[in-house]
Amino acid sequence: STRCQGRGASCRKTMYNCCSGSCNRGRCG
Protein backbone atom coordinates (compact mmCIF):
# COMPACT_ATOMS: atom_id res chain seq x y z
CA SER A 1 0.00 0.00 0.00
CA THR A 2 1.08 3.55 -0.62
CA ARG A 3 2.11 5.56 2.40
CA CYS A 4 0.53 8.93 3.11
CA GLN A 5 0.10 11.48 5.88
CA GLY A 6 -3.00 12.95 7.49
CA ARG A 7 -6.59 11.94 6.91
CA GLY A 8 -8.63 12.22 3.73
CA ALA A 9 -5.51 13.17 1.82
CA SER A 10 -5.99 12.76 -1.90
CA CYS A 11 -3.96 9.84 -3.16
CA ARG A 12 -2.88 9.26 -6.75
CA LYS A 13 -6.31 7.97 -7.76
CA THR A 14 -9.69 9.44 -6.97
CA MET A 15 -11.87 7.76 -4.35
CA TYR A 16 -8.75 6.93 -2.35
CA ASN A 17 -8.27 8.26 1.15
CA CYS A 18 -5.45 8.26 3.66
CA CYS A 19 -6.27 5.84 6.48
CA SER A 20 -3.82 4.83 9.21
CA GLY A 21 -0.90 6.04 7.09
CA SER A 22 -1.87 4.16 3.94
CA CYS A 23 -4.01 4.83 0.89
CA ASN A 24 -7.30 2.94 0.94
CA ARG A 25 -10.38 2.89 -1.26
CA GLY A 26 -13.51 4.58 0.00
CA ARG A 27 -14.00 6.18 3.37
CA CYS A 28 -11.85 5.76 6.45
CA GLY A 29 -13.12 3.71 9.37
Curated annotation (Swiss-Prot):
- SUPFAM superfamilies cross-referenced by the UniProt entry: omega toxin-like (SSF57059)
The question of whether Metal-binding is a record keyword is answered with no
- Where does the signal sequence lie? none
Q: Which domain of life is it from?
A: Eukaryota
**What GO MF annotations does this protein's record show?**
calcium channel regulator activity; ion channel inhibitor activity; toxin activity
Q: Which residues carry this modification: Cysteine amide?
A: C28
Using the UniProt record, give the first listed, main subcellular location.
secreted
- Disulfide connectivity for this sequence is C4-C19, C11-C23, C18-C28
Prosegment residue ranges: 1-3
Q: Any idea what job this protein has?
A: Omega-conotoxins act at presynaptic membranes, they bind and block voltage-gated calcium channels (Cav). This toxin blocks channels of the N-type as well as other types.
Q: What is this protein called?
A: Omega-conotoxin MVIID
